[in-house]
């Protein structure tokens, strides 16, 4: 039986109606500050928490509920005689329902130029303490941190007069997750203040479920999608406009495609399968970029993931509607484009903003995490070195830079053949580099003649250059750094190939 409830919330969504419902059920309400004002201004009877404690709010509101008459009322074990005697001796009222959510710390630190002092003042102390007390004593007390529960709680109280034990346990679990995520946000903010960088002494993060997925990489694997609490970027901020629910593999491929297409400032299109590009292209129009990307490997494009870095127009949509695609993602779609694409009921249309730079990548391993900064180093042609007798032409330079931006997104060992506007062949994930080169060159076919080749890491031997020469490759870009670089340079010189060393490796595992 719930007789007394304590309400103290920062997010006042639904709190007035909830308080009204509690009062109608005969529950006595105690409240604090702005919550009390909102309730009483609505004509609902509620008592200030001072009527419990005998102490006023003090120190600019820092001390309101940190009092034995509050926490004794929450933490007392109801069927423990000693606890009951202590309550009677000290005039402590039992508190059966605690409704609390916390100061808006994440929202505060998200403001531009927020001061440390302002951030500190938005660290809640009394709130988490009440939440944890009530969650600990969930056998007797209900703890509510999410306004979404208000209606169902009122319904349960009307029907049963109390909250079922199993339901209180679920609320307690949610409450501990709520305070844990809150503390993670504070610790990470302080890490930033201390300039601890992307790899601090403790790596903390909190996530909330977006949705269950049909299955994982394979049908026998269970899966769900979670987003980082308090952030609004990347896959966690995607907006699905149309189509079936996303799968695990869709989201993995979408991440790869989205990072790839934003390598370019010109209109660009990338088509992805298993995180590797079937085709990628730039052009003066989005339509032409997509057509070129599709024609790079029209067989593999079937059932692919398409990423575009411009608003999708009707002409591009019409072209994409001609084949089966799993996902199309872009920063926006025109109404005309949506009308065309939504005629295909299963295709997933995703709207998403440009990726933020300076993020970290995290990989779960048994018993730990691997954390690294993203492979988004800013590169400049001026820092590259031409190591062959033949210099690249300006057209070849453009092709080399195009290929170099893409090859880092291909699974190692990675070889990519292109001209200055589109991919021609991609060799991914082979255990030796010359094997990847053979795949890419075979895919490029006759188009390899006069094209360029990019390699994500150095050539351990001269055989890759020799293979490229047989197919007519005109220029090569690679990191260099092998103890046998001279073999590759000699092979390039003998074939009249221009070769550029970047001194930067781009492995992708």
What are these regions (language model features)?
Residues 137, 141-149, 267-278, 419, ...:
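Glycine-rich phosphate/pyrophosphate-binding loops
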Residues 8, 75, 98-103, 144-145, ...:
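Short beta-strand segments
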Residues 3, 16, 92-227, 238, ...:
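Internal alpha/beta core interface subdomains
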């Amino acid at each position: 039986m719930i007789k007394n409830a304590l309400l103290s919330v920062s997010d006042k969504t639904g709190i007035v109606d909830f308080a009204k419902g509690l009062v109608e059920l005969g529950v006595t309400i105690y409240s604090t500050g702005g919550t009390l004002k909102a309730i009483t201004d609505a004509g609902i009877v509620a008592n200030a928490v001072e009527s419990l404690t005998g102490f006023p709010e003090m120190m600019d509101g820092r001390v309101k509920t940190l009092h034995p008459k509050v926490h004794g009322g929450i933490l007392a074990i109801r069927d423990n005689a000693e606890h009951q005697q202590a309550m009677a001796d000290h005039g402590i009222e039992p508190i059966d329902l605690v409704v609390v959510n916390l100061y808006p710390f994440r929202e505060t630190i998200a403001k531009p130029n927020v001061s440390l002092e302002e951030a500190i003042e938005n660290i809640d102390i009394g709130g988490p303490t009440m939440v944890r007390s009530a969650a600990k004593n969930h056998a007797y007390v209900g703890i509510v941190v999410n306004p979404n529960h208000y209606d169902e709680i009122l319904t349960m109280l009307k029907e049963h007069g109390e909250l079922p034990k199993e339901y209180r346990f679920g609320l307690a679990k949610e409450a501990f997750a709520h305070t844990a995520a809150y503390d993670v946000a504070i610790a990470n903010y302080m890490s930033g203040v201390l300039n601890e960088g992307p790899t601090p002494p403790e790596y903390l993060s909190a996530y909330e479920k977006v949705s269950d997925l049909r299955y994982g990489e394979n049908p026998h694997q269970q899966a769900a999608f979670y987003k980082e609490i308090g952030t609004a970027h990347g896959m966690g901020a995607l907006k699905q406009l149309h189509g079936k629910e996303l799968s695990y593999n869709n989201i993995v491929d979408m991440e790869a495609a989205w990072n790839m297409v934003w390598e370019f400032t010109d209109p660009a299109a990338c088509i992805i399968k298993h995180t590797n590009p079937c085709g990628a292209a730039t052009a003066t129009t989005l339509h032409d970029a997509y057509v070129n990307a599709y024609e790079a490997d029209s067989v593999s494009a079937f059932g692919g993931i398409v990423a575009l870095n411009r608003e999708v127009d009707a002409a591009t949509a019409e072209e994409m509607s001609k084949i089966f695609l799993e996902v199309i993602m872009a920063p926006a779609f025109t109404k005309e484009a949506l009308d065309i694409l939504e005629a295909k009921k299963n295709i997933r249309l995703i709207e998403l903003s440009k990726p933020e730079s300076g993020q970290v990548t995290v990989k779960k391993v048994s018993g730990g995490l691997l954390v690294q900064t993203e492979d988004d180093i800013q590169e400049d042609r001026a820092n590259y070195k031409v190591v062959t007798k033949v210099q690249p032409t300006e057209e070849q330079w453009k092709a080399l830079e195009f290929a170099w931006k893409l090859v880092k997104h291909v699974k190692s060992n990675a070889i990519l053949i292109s001209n200055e506007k589109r991919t021609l062949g991609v060799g991914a994930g082979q255990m030796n580099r010359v094997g990847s080169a053979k795949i890419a060159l075979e895919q490029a076919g006759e188009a390899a003649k006069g094209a360029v080749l990019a390699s994500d890491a150095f050539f351990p031997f001269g055989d890759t250059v020799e293979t490229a020469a047989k197919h007519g490759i005109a220029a090569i870009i690679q990191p260099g750094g092998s103890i046998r670089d001279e073999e590759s340079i000699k092979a390039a010189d003998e074939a009249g190939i221009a070769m550029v060393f970047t001194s930067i490796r781009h492995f992708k595992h």
